[in-house]
Amino acid sequence: MAAKIVSVLFLISLLIFASFESSHGSQIVIYWGQNGDEGSLADTCNSGNYGTVILAFVATFGNGQTPALNLAGHCDPATNCNSLSSDIKTCQQAGIKVLLSIGGGAGGYSLSSTDDANTFADYLWNTYLGGQSSTRPLGDAVLDGIDFDIESGDGRFWDDLARALAGHNNGQKTVYLSAAPQCPLPDASLSTAIATGLFDYVWVQFYNNPPCQYDTSADNLLSSWNQWTTVQANQIFLGLPASTDAAGSGFIPADALTSQVLPTIKGSAKYGGVMLWSKAYDSGYSSAIKSSV
């Protein structure tokens, strides 16, 4: 009997350890939503390649504007995106976080004041997160957090938005915060916000910026990576284009990534994995690198 008890306890400890490892291990993060031909959200999650999927984008908001979600060819958020609710739940039931990205490389967005930031935070909470609203474009699904992909403006008030969103972590569902800065440090738009220490994940865009991206040599990228690991964030991710067509420059062939870059950056205590832009361009890249991430 004693031997059986020990065996059971040993098996339980192994399961707990495995759960801990899977919940704290590295992952591939993917942006989804900007191409109607990239497949469904459920299929994206069911691929088994991604640990987090980011819905892109709420590209209009702030400064008196009515916030607007743009999911390109997938659906019209004003009328028929409720069908995504079941897909979101499918992802979450598989242990995959689903975040909503605000901003993007195009669109009209800005924050004019702290009050504006607080108002927008309440809107995000009530419309997409754990709050309540008569209008929820994605139905009753509760997203896991908000991603800041801010690529224009002077950087003011994004720290206030982060504080306001974090303020909703009041014992209810956790609101994860992520940021996608450009690789030159400091980032003109997001460094002040990241300095609050409120961000769980920072996936740095190591592309479209030759001084800090891969270009036959990994030296510039690795130097920039080392600088980014000093910022106040729980985890830092290597942000890359998923193909040569996904960005103007900075694509790293899978064999170069796995031999020249990942072995070094995985030694960083804050290493979280790889972020890819985007699902529409990921025609096998994530599968090729998954085992090395």
Swiss-Prot record:
PANTHER family per the UniProt record, alphabetical: ACIDIC ENDOCHITINASE, ENDOCHITINASE
Family indicated by similarity: Belongs to the glycosyl hydrolase 18 family. Chitinase class II subfamily.
Species annotation: Beta vulgaris (Sugar beet)
Disulphide connectivity of cysteines: 45-91, 75-81, 183-212
Signal peptide positions (record): 1-25
Role this protein plays: This protein functions as a defense against chitin containing fungal pathogens. This endochitinase also exhibits exochitinase activity, i.e. it is capable of hydrolyzing chito-oligosaccharides, including chitobiose.
Catalytic activity: Random endo-hydrolysis of N-acetyl-beta-D-glucosaminide (1->4)-beta-linkages in chitin and chitodextrins
Protein name: Acidic endochitinase SE2
